[in-house]
Amino acid sequence: MLAKRIIPCLDVRDGQVVKGVQFRNHEIIGDIVPLAQRYAEEGADELVFYDITASSDGRTIDKSWVERVAQVIDIPFCVAGGIKSVEDAEKLFAFGADKISINSPALADPDLINRLADRFGVQAIVVGIDSWFEKETGKYWVNQYTGDESRTRQTHWQLLDWVKEVQQRGAGEIVLNMMNQDGVRQGYDIAQLKLVRNLCHIPLIASGGAGEMVHFRDAFIEANVDGALAASVFHKRIIDIGELKDYLRKEKIKIR
């Protein structure tokens, strides 16, 4: 069994790390490079950076901080935001990113997944999915342009259909951002993760809802995810990564 991954997530806007609740009302957390350094030193397995308004603003990621991050950390990192072409991705890899993640651009142009996977290999291509549970219908929908709440919209894709589609097109990993749980620290949506896990034959990363160490344990044991991504609990030092890994080892979970 592969070791499970602990992945801090850094949402970036205007050159700063920010954090919202259910993708709204973002507060500034701090500067990108020192936070990245801190997490690498604390034992994170990987980092994910989302330039959250790049897609909704119609631009690509500011590459200057990507290069600075690559210079100061020695763990893999993934960047996302407004990547619409092989050329966009090429520049980010040249600046030191290990993986790229696409979300809204893939919904606008699903063939982008194929082109990126063909060019860079599936292992370098992550697809982020922003899911929203609609209580009235009991359905999980895929949302787009979630970095800007005024432009966020529900697509015609239901979650499980999109999960199948992105795998067929060459995604090497899926990060499932469960918007209903985001930032509220009540735990990952285990039922949703199980539904996706049953269909997902590539690494699956849970995102949205971590508030206590047991939430990570539940995602790993009950939903068998490959990694757990979290933001506010790490940013605000509610959970220490080293202590979290010790706890998970005691729970017999294989951790790096």
From Swiss-Prot:
InterPro entries given in the database record: Aldolase_TIM (IPR013785), His_biosynth (IPR006062), HisF (IPR004651), IGPS_HisA/HisF (IPR050064), RibuloseP-bd_barrel (IPR011060)
Protein name in the entry: Imidazole glycerol phosphate synthase subunit HisF
Gene (UniProt): hisF
Pathway: Amino-acid biosynthesis; L-histidine biosynthesis; L-histidine from 5-phospho-alpha-D-ribose 1-diphosphate: step 5/9
Keywords of this entry: Amino-acid biosynthesis, Cytoplasm, Histidine biosynthesis, Lyase
GO BP: any one term: L-histidine biosynthetic process
Family stated for the protein in its record: Belongs to the HisA/HisF family.
Active-site residues, record numbering mapped to chain: D11, D130
Catalytic activity, as annotated: 5-[(5-phospho-1-deoxy-D-ribulos-1-ylimino)methylamino]-1-(5-phospho-beta-D-ribosyl)imidazole-4-carboxamide + L-glutamine = D-erythro-1-(imidazol-4-yl)glycerol 3-phosphate + 5-amino-1-(5-phospho-beta-D-ribosyl)imidazole-4-carboxamide + L-glutamate + H(+)
UniProt subcellular location: Cytoplasm
S-S pairs: none
Main localization category: cytoplasm
Native source species: Pasteurella multocida (strain Pm70)
This enzyme's EC code(s): 4.3.2.10
Regions that span the bilayer: none
Entry GO MF terms: imidazoleglycerol-phosphate synthase activity; lyase activity
Subunit structure: Heterodimer of HisH and HisF.
Function: IGPS catalyzes the conversion of PRFAR and glutamine to IGP, AICAR and glutamate. The HisF subunit catalyzes the cyclization activity that produces IGP and AICAR from PRFAR using the ammonia provided by the HisH subunit.
Keyword Cytoplasm: yes
GO CC terms: cytoplasm
PANTHER family: IMIDAZOLE GLYCEROL PHOSPHATE SYNTHASE HISHF (PTHR21235:SF2), IMIDAZOLE GLYCEROL PHOSPHATE SYNTHASE SUBUNIT HISF/H IGP SYNTHASE SUBUNIT HISF/H (PTHR21235)
